Amino acid sequence: MASLRPNRCYRDVDKPPYTRKEYVKGVPQPKVVHFIMGNLSAEFPVKVNLVATRPIQIRHNALEAARVAANKYLTKMCGRMGYKFQIRVYPHQILREHKMATGAGADRISDGMRLAFGKPIGTAARVKEGQAILTVWVNPDKFPAAKEALRRAAMKLPVPCRIVIEQGKELLKL
């Protein structure tokens, strides 16, 4: 199986949206399993967002890695019912790759750049500058845990991020 190309091949928003799955054959499913986790029925007063600082495409495997990192830390620090966590973006953008044959005799097999549109290899979420990527709702005493969880998630993403308190700032001792 071929390895995954580096994210620098896909992170810039330089192509038009390519999202119509009904016209594209063989689009892989996104790796993101759950988009909302934690205690879904409770109300939490503090809402903290992870916000992108520039426009970018985030691949589905990076979103899943960020989700796993943040959710694991929140579960450990707040308990299973002590938080609500949501991924706010969905990977609609279909990523394509024109596979090139390499090695001995590749010139006989390969067509070069003829029909170079590419086959679908994955999906990505298009994020605008200032858009929330992840959101955590917690009680005021668990705010440091939410902040650390978002910091850990930000390390898995290909964009510099800011942590913004959207709701409940007056309840925190900052």
From Swiss-Prot:
Matching Pfam families, A to Z? Answer: Ribosomal_L16
The reply to whether Thylakoid figures as a keyword in the UniProt entry is: no
Highest taxon of the lineage: Archaea
The cross-references to InterPro entries, in alphabetical order and at most eight, read: Ribosomal_uL16 (IPR047873), Ribosomal_uL16_arc (IPR022981), Ribosomal_uL16_CS_euk_arc (IPR018255), Ribosomal_uL16_dom (IPR016180), Ribosomal_uL16_euk_arch (IPR001197), Ribosomal_uL16_sf (IPR036920)
What CDD domains does this protein's entry cite? Ribosomal_L16_L10e (cd01433)
One GO BP annotation is: translation
Gene Ontology molecular function: structural constituent of ribosome
Gene Ontology cellular-component terms for this entry are: cytosolic large ribosomal subunit
Sorted UniProt keywords = Ribonucleoprotein, Ribosomal protein
Question: What's this protein's family per the entry?
Answer: Belongs to the universal ribosomal protein uL16 family.
Q: What is this protein called?
A: Large ribosomal subunit protein uL16
Q: Which organism is it from?
A: Methanocaldococcus jannaschii (strain ATCC 43067 / DSM 2661 / JAL-1 / JCM 10045 / NBRC 100440)
**Which lineage is the organism of this entry classified under, starting from the top rank?**
Archaea, Methanobacteriati, Methanobacteriota, Methanomada group, Methanococci
